[in-house]
């Protein structure tokens, strides 16, 4: 009994829901189709029915399934249709001419703002046509085609410019009539030609000034180089002269130092002397006459005679060479010391030797040299 009662209670409690499900099946299909169409773009899965609570009208109080089903699709097309209308009314379509030129954009904005939302497209079309006309008119007025002059026209204009850079009005009218040009074209051409001439003259002046500056700089550099060269040559000449003087004084000092000890030493030093150097030394020492000159000559003559008379080779060798060396070293140095205390004085003094003494001296020297060579 209890089982049957519970079964009946459950059947009674579940019976209204089944009936409502059966009665609400057609609207559920409508809503299912509309929802599946919307969600098909998002998910490509199989068709899934909506939740059970949304399909039951009893769970949604104050709404009938038919009214709800019939009322839901109505606002959706209204919303979809009404959404572009305010967008079109608030934002009129933008054309490329509106972006490029400001004047056309300003003329197009007042009718668009004054027009209603429903008739927004009409004024836009009208303003577009008007703006195109305005743009064409403004473009034609502001942009002028460049005048293409012929060769004859340019030649005549250049000739006139060569004689007159500024034209008076009668002459300008005459040239325009001759060349089939307007007065304005002739005027503009002369203005442009004057500017060109001015630029050319300025460029030439700048080039000339630059060339002069470069030439001045080059000349200054050349002068500086010449001055440096002259200074360098002067320094070299001065240094060369100083070196010559120092070398000359050094030679004099060395000669005086070598001859001074030889003159003071009493012992005779025997060393071989070449004939040429002995002649030069004897000539230098016999520049000044002194009382010792005859003694030197007599001793040299006696020694030479003794050497010539002796036939033995030893006598020829020893006495003659020793006597000649004694004459060349001791007697001549004593003579130079007696005549002048220093060597430069004796070197710079004039020659006072007589012709007879010079011939005698050269003859004796040649005989001694010949004997020495024969031996």
UniProtKB/Swiss-Prot annotation:
<dbReference type="GO" id="GO:0009952">
    <property type="term" value="P:anterior/posterior pattern specification"/>
</dbReference>
<dbReference type="GO" id="GO:0005654">
    <property type="term" value="C:nucleoplasm"/>
</dbReference>
<protein>
    <recommendedName>
        <fullName>Homeobox protein Hox-A2</fullName>
    </recommendedName>
</protein>
<dbReference type="GO" id="GO:0060037">
    <property type="term" value="P:pharyngeal system development"/>
</dbReference>
<dbReference type="GO" id="GO:0045944">
    <property type="term" value="P:positive regulation of transcription by RNA polymerase II"/>
</dbReference>
<keyword id="KW-0238">DNA-binding</keyword>
<keyword id="KW-0804">Transcription</keyword>
<dbReference type="GO" id="GO:0001709">
    <property type="term" value="P:cell fate determination"/>
</dbReference>
<dbReference type="GO" id="GO:0035284">
    <property type="term" value="P:brain segmentation"/>
</dbReference>
<dbReference type="GO" id="GO:0001227">
    <property type="term" value="F:DNA-binding transcription repressor activity, RNA polymerase II-specific"/>
</dbReference>
<dbReference type="InterPro" id="IPR001827">
    <property type="entry name" value="Homeobox_Antennapedia_CS"/>
</dbReference>
<dbReference type="InterPro" id="IPR020479">
    <property type="entry name" value="HD_metazoa"/>
</dbReference>
<keyword id="KW-0539">Nucleus</keyword>
<feature type="region of interest" description="Disordered">
    <location>
        <begin position="41"/>
        <end position="93"/>
    </location>
</feature>
<dbReference type="GO" id="GO:0061061">
    <property type="term" value="P:muscle structure development"/>
</dbReference>
<dbReference type="GO" id="GO:0007379">
    <property type="term" value="P:segment specification"/>
</dbReference>
<dbReference type="InterPro" id="IPR009057">
    <property type="entry name" value="Homeodomain-like_sf"/>
</dbReference>
<dbReference type="GO" id="GO:0009953">
    <property type="term" value="P:dorsal/ventral pattern formation"/>
</dbReference>
<dbReference type="GO" id="GO:0042474">
    <property type="term" value="P:middle ear morphogenesis"/>
</dbReference>
<dbReference type="GO" id="GO:0048703">
    <property type="term" value="P:embryonic viscerocranium morphogenesis"/>
</dbReference>
<dbReference type="GO" id="GO:0045665">
    <property type="term" value="P:negative regulation of neuron differentiation"/>
</dbReference>
<feature type="region of interest" description="Disordered">
    <location>
        <begin position="197"/>
        <end position="228"/>
    </location>
</feature>
<dbReference type="GO" id="GO:0021568">
    <property type="term" value="P:rhombomere 2 development"/>
</dbReference>
<feature type="DNA-binding region" description="Homeobox">
    <location>
        <begin position="142"/>
        <end position="201"/>
    </location>
</feature>
<keyword id="KW-0371">Homeobox</keyword>
<keyword id="KW-0217">Developmental protein</keyword>
<dbReference type="InterPro" id="IPR017970">
    <property type="entry name" value="Homeobox_CS"/>
</dbReference>
<keyword id="KW-0805">Transcription regulation</keyword>
<feature type="region of interest" description="Disordered">
    <location>
        <begin position="257"/>
        <end position="278"/>
    </location>
</feature>
<comment type="similarity">
    <text>Belongs to the Antp homeobox family. Proboscipedia subfamily.</text>
</comment>
<dbReference type="GO" id="GO:0021658">
    <property type="term" value="P:rhombomere 3 morphogenesis"/>
</dbReference>
<dbReference type="GO" id="GO:0045668">
    <property type="term" value="P:negative regulation of osteoblast differentiation"/>
</dbReference>
<dbReference type="InterPro" id="IPR001356">
    <property type="entry name" value="HD"/>
</dbReference>
<comment type="function">
    <text>Sequence-specific transcription factor which is part of a developmental regulatory system that provides cells with specific positional identities on the anterior-posterior axis.</text>
</comment>
<dbReference type="GO" id="GO:0071300">
    <property type="term" value="P:cellular response to retinoic acid"/>
</dbReference>
<dbReference type="GO" id="GO:0008045">
    <property type="term" value="P:motor neuron axon guidance"/>
</dbReference>
<feature type="short sequence motif" description="Antp-type hexapeptide">
    <location>
        <begin position="94"/>
        <end position="99"/>
    </location>
</feature>
<dbReference type="GO" id="GO:0000978">
    <property type="term" value="F:RNA polymerase II cis-regulatory region sequence-specific DNA binding"/>
</dbReference>
<dbReference type="GO" id="GO:0002076">
    <property type="term" value="P:osteoblast development"/>
</dbReference>
<dbReference type="Pfam" id="PF00046">
    <property type="entry name" value="Homeodomain"/>
</dbReference>
